[in-house]
């Protein structure tokens, strides 16, 4: 299980990303439309003044049960070893174990 502080940090990043999403998107569109370089630098400076954690690249997918950051299946939102345990316990409908 991941430390609670890491999970809270990730939630804080998600909230910041949602808050600044429209601002960042509109700034990027402005940069592509403005022809002069000096205006682009001004808009870029405004974009750089937004919080670092508001960038979507700072987000990381985590298992919603354990908070584990690696080996996540997007469809289930679970990490690999939790997914395997749940499939073996028949807790995920429609998921079957592979056997050959």
Swiss-Prot record:
Function: Binds 16S rRNA, required for the assembly of 30S particles.
Naturally occurring in which organism (per UniProt): Vitis vinifera (Grape)
GO BP annotations listed: translation
Family: Belongs to the universal ribosomal protein uS14 family.
Keyword check for RNA-binding: yes
Protein name as it appears in the record: Small ribosomal subunit protein uS14c
Quaternary structure, from the entry: Part of the 30S ribosomal subunit.
NCBIfam families: PRK08881.1 (NF006477)
């Amino acid at each position: 299980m991941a430390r609670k502080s890491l999970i809270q940090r990730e939630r804080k990043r998600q909230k910041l990303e949602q808050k600044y999403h429209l601002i960042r998107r509109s700034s990027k569109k402005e940069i592509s439309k403005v022809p002069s370089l000096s205006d682009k630098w001004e808009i870029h400076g405004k974009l750089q003044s937004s919080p670092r954690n508001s960038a979507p690249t700072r987000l990381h997918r985590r298992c919603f049960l354990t908070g584990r950051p690696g080996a996540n299946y997007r469809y289930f939102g679970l990490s690999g070893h939790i997914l395997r345990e749940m499939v073996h316990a028949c807790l995920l409908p429609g998921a079957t174990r592979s056997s050959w």
